[in-house]
Amino acid sequence: TVYIDDAVHPWRGERWAHLLADTLPELHAMAQQLGIPRRAFQNRRSGAHYDVPAALRDTAIALGAVAISVQAL
């Protein structure tokens, strides 16, 4: 399952969401569908994820990502 949180993280004048998944193959596949380059992948201790511009959040959900709150992370 792929998840996307509510886009509330401001950075460089935009709002960003975190795209995460149960498995790395799922995560990378969704990022590719969204046109996000692999170099944007962040393998952090807090969790592997991609930062997604808020403008792509609805597209991610339409492609099957499950919307979650920041608190659910």
Where are these regions (language model features)?
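Generic structural "secondary-structure junction" signal
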Residues: 6, 21-22, 43, 52-54, ...
